[in-house]
């Protein structure tokens, strides 16, 4: 826990993303724990509330996704970021990535050079290749590779060089082009063009098969995420719920860990691609009493579905939290328990202030984002 990660990028002032990388891991965790305890102090005045020990993973080589800005020129491309001083910095050797991912990122720099694709220049609004997005599946070490382009003009060049790349790296299973024509700081556009027959990457956390498609959200630290899902499964099992809701369900990680063949599960997520992935997982697992729907979670809770109230509700919202309206809906449904997984303890605390008739009984910090201010929290609320 006292391990220090030595990062040359940070030392040279080229990248400050891991702002706490100079602190020992134990010190980072202590600061995060203190912040969490202070934010949730108003909700732990009952003797039953437990702050469980934080869950940690490796301090380097843990990240499964790289979002690289493509800089430089067609003959000398750079995958990385613009440093605070304005220079193009290659981040292919970023210590957050496993060694095999670092090697592939270096190969992708050569790929862009061989294909002769001009990087997009924000200052001149010219060029083609904006980003390269690379996602790694830990279960098999396989990859999904996405090229974010301004237009279709460079697709032929990618297709020309792709066979050699995939022969060298057969673990690349999914390749796509995302079209983002707008001159704005937007990561991706609406249109996705697949250059491979396969359109999804398979992952497995614990005994649950999960799938990743280009636009579906997926946890970036598989090692700790697996522990997060397993903990959720154990906490939910204590209540033996007859029915479950999983709101903001993404690809179904929480719900599928907590589901069983005889328990009806309803999963709600606004991103249709993620729902398609969740349905594939449920089918593979032989879960017949599961339905996943691409809807807004707040709207769903206010609709006709509100007449069929579940015994336990899982929520895993984005950083903005679930909001006052959904808090009121959950209070009215009065399930046995609410399991809240949060990536923003500030909005978690705000939401807890709007949920009525429940007491906080368990809290656990999961350090999915070492060296940063961010962390995940699992909070269990039990009906009074």
UniProtKB/Swiss-Prot annotation:
GO terms for biological process: rRNA base methylation. Its EC number is 2.1.1.189. Keywords: 4Fe-4S, Iron, Iron-sulfur, Metal-binding, Methyltransferase, rRNA processing, S-adenosyl-L-methionine, Transferase. One of its GO terms (molecular function) is iron ion binding. The active site is at residue 343. It catalyses: uridine(747) in 23S rRNA + S-adenosyl-L-methionine = 5-methyluridine(747) in 23S rRNA + S-adenosyl-L-homocysteine + H(+). Pfam families: tRNA_U5-meth_tr. S-adenosyl-L-methionine binds at residues 219, 248, 269, 316. [4Fe-4S] cluster binds at residues 7, 15, 18, 94. The keyword Chloroplast does not apply. Catalyzes the formation of 5-methyl-uridine at position 747 (m5U747) in 23S rRNA. HAMAP family: 23SrRNA_methyltr_RlmC (MF_01012). Belongs to the class I-like SAM-binding methyltransferase superfamily. RNA M5U methyltransferase family. RlmC subfamily. This is 23S rRNA (uracil(747)-C(5))-methyltransferase RlmC.
